[in-house]
Amino acid sequence: IFAGASLSIWRRQPALQTGVLALGALALLVANAALSAGRPLEAVVPSWIAFFVLTIGGERLELSRLMPIARTMRLAFGAISFVLLGSALCAAFVPGALRLSGLLMFATAAWLVRHDIATRTVRAAGLTRYIALSLLAGYVWLALGGAVLAANGAAPGSGLWDAALHAVLVGF
């Protein structure tokens, strides 16, 4: 239902941010279907992470409409998101796909640090500043988790796998 609703929203409002949100919903649908079909947990975790990253990324992209961002940079975010979904879905089957997912998580974090409105609202006061600082700290954790995965692929069950998952799922 969630993926269908997200696709319906994207069809009604065909914008990059709604497309990225729909990709996140698709990642969740595929991950849950794979788990229900008997795939091992570690095979679906990359798709769950993609859901998480794409959903937050899509929401932040929507808020970035308030800032002037070059069309090419917006399209770059869309391309990163699309390939992130693909690499996450393939991570259980294709050697190197998890490394690519990590690299794309790092690229997502770099894009957000460069283009998110939080880079401007961090200069505000009170709650606005607190939220901006929290978001920027989360992007650092996303970059760290992505870098760990990109550097070594982090085999499920290893200490590096745990470190990458904690960095992304707790830090981000």
Where are the language model's segments positioned?
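Hydrophobic alpha-helical transmembrane segments of multi-pass integral membrane proteins
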Residues: 1-172
